[in-house]
Amino acid sequence: MCGIVGYIGTNNAKGILLEGLEKLEYRGYDSAGIALQNKDLVTVVKEKGRIADLASLVPSDAFGTTGIGHTRWATHGKPNHENAHPHQSKSGRFTIVHNGVIENYTLLKEEYLKNHSFISDTDTEVIVQLIELFAEKLSTKEAFKKALSLLHGSYAICLIDQTDTETLYAAKNKSPLLIGKGENFNVIASDAMAVLKETDEFVEIMDKEIVIVTKDGFTLETLEGEEVSRASYTAELDASDIEKGTYPHYMLKEIDEQPAVTRKIIQAYQNEAGEINVDQTILDEILSSDRIHIVACGTSYHAGLVGKNLIEKMAKIPVEVHVSSEFGYNLPLMSKKPLFIFITQSGETADSRQCLVKVKELGYRTLTLTNVPGSTLDREADHSMYLYAGPEIAVASTKAYTAQISVLAVLAVSLGREIGDAEALSINLAAELGIVATAMEAMVSSKEVIEHIAGEYLATSRNAFFLGRNIDYFVAMEAALKLKEISYIQAEGFASGELKHGTIALIEDGTPVLALITQESINWNIRGNVNEVLARGAKTCVFAMENVAQPGDRFVIPQVHPLLTPLASVIPCQLLAYYAALHRDCDVDKPRNLAKSVTVE
């Protein structure tokens, strides 16, 4: 949520900031702005709307060798010009951008800024006014540090001082922020993707650290004044990975990339003998536990439900799955030796990170499944397994979901083999995942079929229901989430056996009901449920796997191993959501009110 880009160097920062903000659009935002510093003149341009709207407002001759930019997701105050970032102090000396939530900003207003008038409704403006207040008696660095010491909550901040053209200041706590190293310039960014065109060498800023940046270098130190030395790392990304290429939308590109991602996971977790292999220390850690808790949000939570099924079948360890945002309110009754698995595409999800901090304080061991090496949850967990999905730009997750399930399958089968589970020993997972990849290719080559179904069932619908049983129920929930995210249709995924316990009351003439069937054991049960809603006027559609398909089913899913069916059955559901959104003229990659990476609680 929100994004920051900062630049200090010898070139004009304008284009670098605007292009960087474009690369951060996937994080979600409702307004944007930049500030350019040219000698002692600071020019601020900001507005509600898209980056393209902002770019049209920036004067063609705007210039500054130091600058900061921001995309805002409203948390305090409406999305409007006044609340957009950057914010300036009363005199205009200080200009700031900020991601995060300051929990005690009203108290700080009362205690320190009673006589100040505020232009915006934001917590951010309180920070910049505090800095100016303290700068009456302190240096900029010390005033910044004093203000930071008073803040309760999360922040990533970039600050410029009108009286100092040679320095850019930044700090973070619980919100991501990086330093990008260049020659005669340095950059600050929420995400490496924002500035990959400028540099691929980065240094992490840790919580409660401040960084003083010039064009020639930077100094990291704690709020207590202790200097910090930290090695840089090279981002394992290519600028071309974050371009759409010939695709109209990132989401469609990322759906099409799933076969390649699945094969990449096979290669990443294969040993020299061609067998799927997981780090032995991870296996030993998990097998020594007596219960596994999977903690995740949204799509990752749905992947976790599939993971529970796989791990319990193979490893014979009980698994609980928790929604991150609810986990901290009522901790489960802990067994003697639990282990926690955190699933997060970005590795920065605020709710999941807070859960990880809590369980580590309690002394429990942790494993993160993430797509971003070097992310906060990757650094802070005891162990990590990577998804190898490459950058996922579209807000609606597709390839990260299938990557999560694939890696969970790798983990489950590896655990099962360690304990001699017959099913785990009998499955050639590399081969079976290869079959999945081939099935995915066949389905992404049948887009026109799904496009037609989307137009027929969903183009003008106000709501839709997805039905499934057993493992198909988990995919039904993910299918409904995808549809509601990008088409704005009120969609829900249900266990079809629960229809008669309330949901069937919502069925009326023309209600779209889509059923997923991949398991022989529940084939006729769910078809009975389909007939029930059909009798009450629903417009029904069945997506079925080859071995259970019947005449009249609208889409046949190629056969894959029974434990891996979610990897296949979700593909037509993703395409269905995509084409439904197109039919309804929705913004596929940047749906309203949504953020890719939720970095505030």
From Swiss-Prot:
This is Glutamine--fructose-6-phosphate aminotransferase [isomerizing]. Residues 2-216 form the Glutamine amidotransferase type-2 domain. It comes from Listeria innocua serovar 6a (strain ATCC BAA-680 / CLIP 11262). Its EC number is 2.6.1.16. Keywords: Aminotransferase, Cytoplasm, Glutamine amidotransferase, Repeat, Transferase. It is an enzyme of class 2 (transferase). It is found in: Cytoplasm. SUPFAM superfamilies: N-terminal nucleophile aminohydrolases (Ntn hydrolases), SIS domain. It comes from the Bacteria. Residues 282-421, 453-591 form the SIS domain. The lineage of its organism: Bacteria, Bacillati, Bacillota, Bacilli, Bacillales. Catalyzes the first step in hexosamine metabolism, converting fructose-6P into glucosamine-6P using glutamine as a nitrogen source. The gene is glmS. CDD domains: GFAT, SIS_GlmS_GlmD_1, SIS_GlmS_GlmD_2. GO terms for molecular function: carbohydrate derivative binding; glutamine-fructose-6-phosphate transaminase (isomerizing) activity. One of its GO terms (cellular component) is cytosol. GO terms for biological process: carbohydrate metabolic process; fructose 6-phosphate metabolic process; protein N-linked glycosylation; UDP-N-acetylglucosamine metabolic process.
